[in-house]
Amino acid sequence: MDQDFDLDEGAGQFNLKTTLMMFTSNDSQNDDGIWSPGSPYQALEDPSFLDKHFVSDPDRYTADELYSALEKMDGKSDLIGMDDMDNDNCYSLSPPDSGSLPISPASTSPSSYHSSGGEDLMDCYPSIDILQQASEELLYSKDDDYEICSSGPLLAYTNANSVATSAVHQNQQQQQRRLNQAGFPHQNSNGLVRFKSSQPRVLNPASISLNAPSSSFNPQSTSSTPATSSSSSSSTNGGFVKSSTGERRKYPPLRLDEEEIKLCKKEGICLPDFFPLTKAEERDLKRIRRKIRNKRSAQTSRKRKQDYIEQLEDRVSESTKENQALKQQIERLSSENQSVISQLKKLQAQLGQNAKRTTQAGRCLAVFMLSACLLVSPQLSPLGNQDNQKVLECIEEACQPSATSMNSANSAQRAIAGVTAPSVVIPSGGPVMVSTNANRQMNRNAVLNHHNNSKYPASGNQNHHPIALEDLNHPPPTLQPKQSYQQQHQPSMYRRSDETIAMAMAKIGARKGSSTSSSSASSVASSTSTSSATSPIYRTSRTLGAFEDQCDASSDDSNCANMPSLVPMKMSAQPPKRKIVTMNGQPRVTYRAVPASSVNVEQAQYYKVPQQKVQYVTMDRPIKYEVLQLNDYIKMEEESTIRLPNSWSTAGPRLHPQVNASSRTVRPLTVATPVHYNGPSAKKIKTQMF
């Protein structure tokens, strides 16, 4: 009911009939057939109605009295037959909006709900749960009882917009008809909630505003009425809600614990006892519960830390006690260790004194026994005194220098006999002059020789041909054994000491004639001969003393009687020039020695070897030549005589043993006749500096 009414008490007088007609006209807007024939409102037109129910004097009626009279009439159903007709009262839940349709049949607001026409009155209407209202409308039944609609106060006058308001209601009814024709279920008009009164309508006189302005509308009083009706329609005991359709719906209760209730009171948050909750209430409830969870988590964390600290304290106390016990044990062990060390030192001192005494006695005994052994050992030697004396004399003779003497008469025989041995010694100074004692053989060889043989007389005496160290004439050819080319050892200027001792021992053994000495001497001689066969042994002498090894090795001293004495070597101040025979020169005659066992007297055998061309070489130092020949013997000649340095003069000691020529006998020597040999032989010469 959007019409505004007001009871105007102008000077305490008003027209009773006119006022009643105004009340009835307000209801006539909702029902077009209220003034139709047979309607109860037609009784107002009867003049006896006022006389019957109201006093004709209008002064005695005030607004309150008139209202109470109308209530009595309403209770008696005299004015309107409540038992015979349905009185439907409605009020709008939304501002009126012409020409709008609801969004859906369950909607309670038009599509243009937020249009410009209704935004000014939004605060005048309460917020209603749309889902709840839709469920109530869907479950709507005409036969159900309706609750009393506590509408706003009825105003006693109609404002200037009453005509426009009736037009709005007509439009709403037309919209409802169109919805019904479109197939939507039966619903109330948009924005309207219908209530059917099950009890007589009771109006509170205090709610009627008599001093309200005639042209004003109070939205606050209007908005409070729907809120009250909404709360009364939805709040019941036990969380049950009875809707307008009479359906009882139960919502779960909101259960809060003591901490949540306490925190809500502390923060001033009021929450309902049952669901549903608004978004703000849900937000507050979540915040409260989050605070409670954080509080409990913090308490748990603090408790865990406290437990950990207590455990650490217990461990510290236990460790402290254990440390104290270990300290006491260490002190006790250190004292025991000191006592044990002192005892050990005393024991070591006592043992050291005893050990020194025993070692001194042992050392003295060992020295005494060693000295006794040294004194007794010479007497136990297997060698006799004479043998030792002979060895010493032989060594002394080997160290004495030999006097310069001419060659003996039998030196040539020893030289020729020595050629048969496999070892040949080549002097370092010049060629060895060889002479034969066979006069006939020498004369025959001299006739066949193409060279100048006047130098070689028929006499076999070696004294006719003394060795001239500075003679520049060509000496007779040197007989050298045929050797194969192989690696040679370094030549030595002097005889080695071990060879000298071996010779002396061999000599001593030969003189004694013992089998042991003879075997040792022969073994030494054989080893010397074998070694000399592989490599020539160089001596410092220019004479035939090179063959003394064979003489010394023999068991008979008579064969060594004609051994010539050793001749010292001399060197000139000028550098020597040596002649090396090559194959490019004219052939010359050389001789080859043949062993006596293979000599046939009837058929003379000797070989003629072509000589080589002489090549002059100037050297600054003495040179030793090592001659290697594969097939035959060669001859080496000297341009000038080599002189040794002053340190090598005759005054210096000689390592060769002194040979007694008188004790030597002539050795038999057989020399074959020379035979012409025309085949060239391959020769190799190796020069070595020293």
UniProtKB/Swiss-Prot annotation:
Record bears the keyword Transcription regulation: yes
Record flagged with keyword Coiled coil: yes
GO molecular function: DNA-binding transcription factor activity, RNA polymerase II-specific; RNA polymerase II cis-regulatory region sequence-specific DNA binding
Source species of the chain: Caenorhabditis elegans
Effect of gene knockout: RNAi-mediated knockdown targeted to the gonadal distal tip cells (DTC) causes DTC migration defects. Significant reduction in expression of src-1 and tln-1 in DTCs. Causes slow growth after hatching.
Role of this protein: Probable transcription factor, required during migration of the gonadal distal tip cells (DTC). Probably regulates cell adhesion of DTCs via modulation of expression of genes involved in integrin-mediated adhesion, including tln-1, src-1, and integrin pat-2. Modulates expression of genes involved in protein trafficking during embryogenesis, including emo-1, sec-61, calu-1, sec-24.1, enpl-1, sar-1 and tfg-1.
Taxonomic lineage from the root: Eukaryota, Metazoa, Ecdysozoa, Nematoda, Chromadorea
InterPro entries reported for this sequence: bZIP (IPR004827), bZIP_sf (IPR046347), CREB_ATF_subfamily (IPR051381)
Protein name from the UniProt record: CREB-H transcription factor homolog let-607
Annotated signal sequence range: none
Region of interest called Disordered, as start-end residue ranges on this chain: 87-118, 166-192, 205-253, 451-495, 509-536
Keywords associated with the record: Coiled coil, Developmental protein, DNA-binding, Nucleus, Transcription, Transcription regulation
Family of the protein in this entry: Belongs to the bZIP family.
Location relative to the cell: Nucleus
Region (Leucine-zipper) residue spans: 326-333
SMART domains xrefs: BRLZ
GO (cellular component) term, any one: chromatin
Matching Pfam families: bZIP_1
Domain of life: Eukaryota
Main location: nucleus
Gene3D superfamilies in the record: 1.20.5.170
Region Basic motif, residue ranges: 286-321
Polar residues bias locations: 451-464
